[in-house]
Amino acid sequence: MINRFLIALSFLTVLPLKFKEINEKELIRSIIFFPFIGFLEGVFCIFLVNIFKQIFSSSVISIILLVFLFSVRGIFHIDGLSDTFDALFYKGTGQKEKDLQQRLQIMKDSVIGVAGAVALVLDVLCRFAFVKELIDINQFLIFLFMFCFSRWIVIPLMYYGKPARTTGLGVLFIGKISSWQVIISTVLPIFLLVYFTIEKNFIFLPLIALFLFFISYILKKFFERKFNGITGDHLGATVEITEIVFLICFLLGEKLWLSY
């Protein structure tokens, strides 16, 4: 079990870890720890906020958190976001099969396009602004749920989705995980959802979670229509999109709740 946790930690981060054994079977089983990895990211972000909030402004702390996340995650998710947007903004020839193959080829290209660059800039700007706002209103504890949920949201995509390629990281997971893995991985997000809803009085949080689940379903259908399946890049893009949409919805919900 510890070995699977370390595999998940190594897969989702840039930490150079060693394991007793790593193979495709163990890698697939490690996905039950994805939400917990997100939870740990939240813990460290909260720790950093508490350390620096008496020293720096919320703007500086927001930048520190972005640097921390980039240092831990590397380009794993943002690369998927940029590749996905580059492929989506390919104009196409009108020939379905040819356009499909071209989009998949664009995602494999190491050169970033204009659409991908714009997506990255918007992602960073949104994170900076929304994280700063969370710190300003002293609601940064929600990082625990946000990062946990964004890691979990790709697991249903893996379970219900089909791979767009026969090669790549996505093939290792998509369509290959079991229902019990989905159930086990859901325990921590549900616990945090109940905790923040009841103990912190975030009564709008379940609605946000349902909305994000709906968004992930829409993304799944969209990816399958445009790419005839899901790739690892799409999973990474989904994590990024989920976190941005969550921040928007949470801040909006908090403002409306306080005004009410």
From Swiss-Prot:
InterPro entries xrefs: CobS
TM stretches of this protein: 31-51, 55-75, 111-131, 140-160, 177-197, 202-222, 234-254
Biological process, per Gene Ontology: cobalamin biosynthetic process
Keywords: Cell inner membrane, Cell membrane, Cobalamin biosynthesis, Magnesium, Membrane, Transferase, Transmembrane, Transmembrane helix
Top class in the EC scheme: transferase
Family named by the database record: Belongs to the CobS family.
PANTHER family per record: ADENOSYLCOBINAMIDE-GDP RIBAZOLETRANSFERASE
Function statement: Joins adenosylcobinamide-GDP and alpha-ribazole to generate adenosylcobalamin (Ado-cobalamin). Also synthesizes adenosylcobalamin 5'-phosphate from adenosylcobinamide-GDP and alpha-ribazole 5'-phosphate.
Name this polypeptide is given: Adenosylcobinamide-GDP ribazoletransferase
Organism: Thermodesulfovibrio yellowstonii (strain ATCC 51303 / DSM 11347 / YP87)
Gene: cobS
